[in-house]
């Protein structure tokens, strides 16, 4: 549930920032291409935005790794990362509301805050070895290859099936989890994009709210329940 909420946050932020400033702050693979195209065209404005997004994302990921390392034993401390991300998203929204219309420097500030938040979120998903929540290339690859493995293993198990014999299904998470993550990412990007076109920066309440819901879920389990070092459900 929590990873799916984070996927909603990732898709929403990228859609809103892309519509607003023509740059990606979560999906850095695509943003790297935007940077390359801007450099090839000699587009200083687009290149500056994309480069800042990359750097801020990297800083956010590094900060996330530091915060996660403060946990004890094999239990990463999730709440500091989630709280920091929520504060960045809400701070970005408050800043945007308070100073609009944004000049160029203020736009760069919004881009940096969004990329910092998405870097934190990416570090969290990476540490927990779950589906990615800020970019979908790996998630789609995992879904496709996992589906093939799941089907092949199931067919072999059915051919050898006998009473009392294990089913032979793959031990890893079922591929539908990655598929659903992608669908939620897509749906949230569509929804937040539509909201942004009608309500401008207020659309960012969607990703901020999703992260706040994850925080509430984590508070119910003490930040990270035993055995959750590799999962965030």
Regions found by a protein language model. Name each.
Residues 1-233:
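Alpha-helical transmembrane segments of multi-pass membrane proteins
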């Amino acid at each position: 549930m929590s990873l799916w909420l984070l996927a909603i946050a990732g898709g929403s932020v990228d859609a809103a920032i892309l519509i607003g400033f023509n740059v990606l702050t979560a999906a850095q693979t695509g943003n790297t291409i935007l940077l390359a195209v801007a450099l090839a065209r000699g587009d200083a404005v687009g290149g500056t935005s994309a480069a800042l997004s990359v750097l801020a994302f990297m800083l956010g990921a590094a900060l996330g790794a530091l915060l996660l390392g403060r946990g004890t034993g094999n239990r990463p401390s999730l709440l500091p990362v989630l709280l920091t991300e929520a504060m960045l998203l809400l701070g970005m929204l408050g800043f945007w509301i308070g100073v609009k219309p944004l000049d160029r420097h203020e736009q760069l500030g919004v881009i940096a805050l969004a990329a910092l938040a998405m870097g934190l979120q990416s570090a969290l998903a990476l540490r927990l070895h779950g589906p990615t929540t800020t970019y979908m290339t790996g998630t789609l690859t995992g879904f496709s290859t996992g589906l093939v493995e799941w089907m092949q293993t199931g067919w072999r198990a059915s051919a050898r099936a006998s009473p009392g014999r294990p089913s032979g299904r793959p031990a890893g998470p079922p591929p539908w989890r990655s598929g659903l993550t992608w669908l939620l990412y897509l749906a949230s990007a569509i929804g937040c994009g539509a909201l942004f076109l009608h309500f401008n920066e207020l659309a960012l309440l969607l990703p901020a709210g999703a992260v706040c819901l994850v925080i509430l879920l984590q508070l119910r389990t003490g930040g990270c329940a035993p055995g959750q070092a590799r999962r965030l459900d």
